[in-house]
């Protein structure tokens, strides 16, 4: 066998070994890893996400109200929600605008991330606009306080979805979280107000 053929045979061994090892290699860890399920978020986090987008519409926006949205495709975690809707108001534009924040795309009205609605004429209601900086207490902490201060809550939480509303009413000094045992205030038999600035318990509603 001449020297050329010897060199060819000598080189083909490592090349073949590499080719076989490539075929037999294990799939990457990324290929094995299942897609992570969407997780709900707390109210304060969702509020700040929407506020960042709302400021591009009007730099003087203040919060008018916010509420949680129950999304059946997202796991229930007390103190969090799969989606939230907030309304911001601009004195400069004399208008209000609603935004949603969702952790998943859920047709027809919920879109992944922050989604802006159309501006509407500003109207005076029962709630007062407030600065986002006054919301210092998150929904998970508000829930714990409401549960501790409301004796009936332990039984109610076993059979009801927990919902949250944020606004500033005339009867309270600061904006407040309303922790609702139910999907809405209208259908709930129990709710509690927690100060969104200090975390103090304010009142129970039946």
Residue ranges and their predicted role:
Residues 9, 23-206:
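Long, terminal "pre-/pro-" and other extracytoplasmic accessory regions
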Residues 1-26:
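Secretory targeting signatures
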């Amino acid at each position: 066998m001449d020297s050329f053929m010897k060199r060819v045979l000598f080189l083909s061994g490592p090349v073949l070994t590499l080719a076989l090892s490539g075929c037999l290699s294990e799939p990457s860890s990324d290929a094995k890893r299942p897609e992570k399920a969407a997780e709900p978020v707390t109210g304060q986090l969702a509020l700040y996400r929407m506020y960042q987008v709302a400021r591009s519409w009007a730099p003087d926006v203040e919060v008018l109200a916010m509420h949680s949205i129950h999304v059946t495709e997202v796991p229930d975690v007390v103190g969090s929600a799969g989606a939230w809707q907030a309304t911001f108001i601009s004195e400069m534009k004399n208008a209000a605008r609603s935004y949603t924040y969702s952790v998943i795309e859920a047709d027809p009205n919920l879109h992944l991330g922050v989604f802006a609605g159309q501006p509407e004429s500003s109207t005076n209601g029962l709630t007062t606009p407030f600065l986002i900086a006054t919301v210092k207490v998150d929904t998970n902490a508000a829930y714990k306080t409401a549960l501790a201060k409301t004796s009936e809550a332990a039984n109610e939480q076993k059979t009801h979805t927990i919902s949250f509303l944020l606004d500033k009413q005339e009867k309270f000094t600061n904006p407040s979280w309303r922790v609702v045992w139910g999907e809405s205030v209208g259908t709930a038999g129990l709710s509690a107000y927690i100060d969104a600035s200090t975390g103090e318990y304010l009142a129970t509603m039946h």
